[in-house]
From Swiss-Prot:
Keywords: Cytoplasm, Methyltransferase, rRNA processing, S-adenosyl-L-methionine, Transferase. It comes from Photorhabdus laumondii subsp. laumondii (strain DSM 15139 / CIP 105565 / TT01). Homodimer. Belongs to the class IV-like SAM-binding methyltransferase superfamily. RNA methyltransferase TrmH family. RlmB subfamily. This is 23S rRNA (guanosine-2'-O-)-methyltransferase RlmB.
Length: 244
């Protein structure tokens, strides 16, 4: 069993973290640049034979996505399950988690993972039945974060939120109708930030399991932000508070 990853950042991140997963690497024939060449040399240093391919073949493998001239066939990475949560929580003193409810676009999933990694989030939690897959597109957008941030798929998100609360983790949901903003909220302790789908927001049951609802103040003419942008705004307000 194998999967495809593509893009310089995604391939480089896997090489740095889990090089034994590589099976085959394909590079665009005739392409040489200052970012790709060192990566090729690094792959060759672990014994990988680089296979050359034309652009049409690479485009077909990635269904027309921007592959930056490199794709790799790799062994699947570790799949985190909900029963991994207790061990993960036991390893950190002040858990900082991100929960995505209904984010179905792999570009948004990848962007949220990238922001989560930059913000120091310990894990991202998503439901099995209402979420984008961590496919090659999401990994490319994540720019390596898919290899560093545990992505935990859960069967029942409401049950998982209850579990987090049993571990004294404050569950903070985002909703436009919240009576206070994230800048008025205390985001310094053990917490899980819950982001809903763009437009629809969190599902009713998810919302009911939040300890607190916050909003992002909007002063312009648009009514909402892209979910990955909103996630970044909220995460880095938490980072600001937690580092002050």
């Amino acid at each position: 069993m194998s999967e495809i990853i593509y893009g310089i950042h995604a391939v480089k991140a896997l090489l740095e973290r889990d090089p034994q997963r590589f099976i085959e690497v394909y590079v665009l024939k005739g392409r040489e640049d200052r970012r790709l060449t060192p990566l090729i040399h690094a792959l060759e240093s672990i014994g990988m034979t680089i296979q050359l391919a034309n652009r049409q073949w690479l485009d077909n493998q990635t269904e027309g996505a921007v592959h930056q001239g490199i794709i790799a066939k790799v062994k699947p990475g570790r799949q985190y399950q909900e029963n991994d949560l207790p061990d993960l929580l036991a390893q950190v003193e002040t858990p900082f988690l991100l929960v995505l409810d209904g984010v179905t676009d792999p570009h948004n999933l990848g962007a949220c993972l990238r922001s989560a990694d930059a913000a120091g989030v310990h894990a991202v939690i998503i439901p099995r039945d209402r979420s984008a897959q961590l496919n090659a597109t999401a990994k490319k957008v994540a720019c390596g974060a898919a290899e560093s941030v545990p992505l935990i798929r859960v069967t029942n998100l409401a049950r998982t939120l209850r579990l987090l609360q049993e571990y004294n983790i404050w569950v903070v949901g985002t909703a436009g109708e919240a009576d206070h903003t994230l800048y008025q909220s205390k985001l310094t302790g053990p917490m899980a930030l819950v982001m809903g789908a763009e437009g629809e927001g969190m599902r009713r049951l998810t919302r009911e399991h939040c300890d607190e609802l916050i909003s992002i103040p909007m002063v312009g003419s648009v009514s909402s932000l892209n979910v990955s942008v909103a996630t970044g705004v909220c995460l880095f307000e938490a980072v600001r508070q937690r580092s002050s």
